């Protein structure tokens, strides 16, 4: 993620980071002279960002969206349907790059196959 932020963010560009998040994500954005936009989540959404939260956070300066599933530190994992709904929002904003952090795929214990946002919404690949 660090190299991606350095390569793609210009001063003042925004990176949307759902909370809770890996501790260094915002700092990496700051080193790249970007602005971290933290979206708070809670127990009511099982610590997952909703499509509505994402849509409301997007501005003309948004260039990067970080999604980590299974998440560190919460351990939650997005479902295929949740990722498809988030993907529908992102399809409307082709200038936003997606950083999908799949580091914890091996500890997915839901009994369902692993799925990331690009598996759920392949149109986002380009």
Task: Annotate each predicted stretch with a short phrase.
Residues 1, 21-25:
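Conserved coil-to-alpha-helix start sites within the AMP-binding
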Residues 12, 57-59, 119-126:
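Short, intrinsically disordered, charge-balanced linker/junction segments flanking boundaries
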Residues 41-112, 118:
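Active-site phosphate-binding strand-loop segment of PLP-dependent enzymes
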Residues 1-14:
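Phosphate-binding glycine-rich loop
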Residues 13, 34, 90-97, 125:
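A short helix->loop->beta-strand "cap" motif at the edges of active sites that frequently abuts
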Residues 31-37:
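A short helix-loop-beta submotif of the ANL/AMP-binding
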Residues 7, 27-29:
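Hydrophobic/aromatic ligand-binding patch that stacks against planar heteroaromatic rings
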Residues 19, 38-42:
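Short beta->alpha connector loops at strand-helix junctions that form conserved
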């Amino acid at each position: 993620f660090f190299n991606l932020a350095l390569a793609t963010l210009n001063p003042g560009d925004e990176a949307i980071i759902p909370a809770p998040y890996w501790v260094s994500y915002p700092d990496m954005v700051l080193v790249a002279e970007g602005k971290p936009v933290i979206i708070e989540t809670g127990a009511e959404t099982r610590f997952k960002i909703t499509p509505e939260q994402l849509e409301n956070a997007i501005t003309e300066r948004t260039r990067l969206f970080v999604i980590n599933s299974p998440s560190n530190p919460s351990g939650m994992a997005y479902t295929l349907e949740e990722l498809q709904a988030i993907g529908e929002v992102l399809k409307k904003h082709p200038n936003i790059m997606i950083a999908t952090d799949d580091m914890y795929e091996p500890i997915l214990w839901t009994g369902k196959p692993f799925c990331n946002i690009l598996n759920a919404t392949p149109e986002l690949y380009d």
